[in-house]
Swiss-Prot record:
Belongs to the bacterial ribosomal protein bL17 family. This is Large ribosomal subunit protein bL17. The keyword S-adenosyl-L-methionine does not apply. GO terms for biological process: translation. The gene is rplQ. Part of the 50S ribosomal subunit. Contacts protein L32. Coiled coil: none annotated.
């Protein structure tokens, strides 16, 4: 019985799952929007939300704690300096998940996960990306 067991397995080992989530956090912090499968996006959301909540405090212990979760120093700097100050007055709900149909080949549900009030120049506009995919 799977009672009271949190999280999704995502059909990988625990070390693979931790590394995958850390890499997805780095990509999300860098580009402020990523395209992934829906279960991965749903698993990533609470992970990044806790990191941003910690980053709002912005002291040395927080920096070390976040650096132990994700190993990219540039991503940690952006998380604490830019995103932490951007969401300082917001009590939560820093990300949104937008469903984007199904992947061709295996019909896996695809979703965009992005920051609320994100910098559009960091990655691009979802509507433009969708229009380009339809044209191709």
């Amino acid at each position: 019985m799977r009672h009271k067991i949190k999280g999704r397995k995502l059909n990988v080992t625990s070390s693979h799952r931790q590394a995958m989530l850390a890499n997805m956090v780095v990509a999300l912090v860098t580009h402020e929007q990523i395209k992934t499968t829906l279960p991965k996006a749903k698993e990533l959301r609470p992970y990044i939300e806790t990191l941003i909540t910690k980053a709002k405090k912005a002291d040395l212990t927080v920096r070390r704690s976040v650096l132990s979760k994700i190993k990219d120093k540039k991503a940690v700097e952006k998380l604490i300096n830019i995103l932490g100050t951007r969401y300082k007055d917001r009590p939560g709900g820093y990300t949104r998940i937008i469903k984007a149909g199904f992947r061709y080949g295996d019909l896996a549900p695809i979703a965009y996960i992005e920051f609320v009030d994100r910098d559009i120049n960091a990655k691009g506009n979802i509507q433009q990306d969708a229009n380009e995919e339809i044209k191709n």
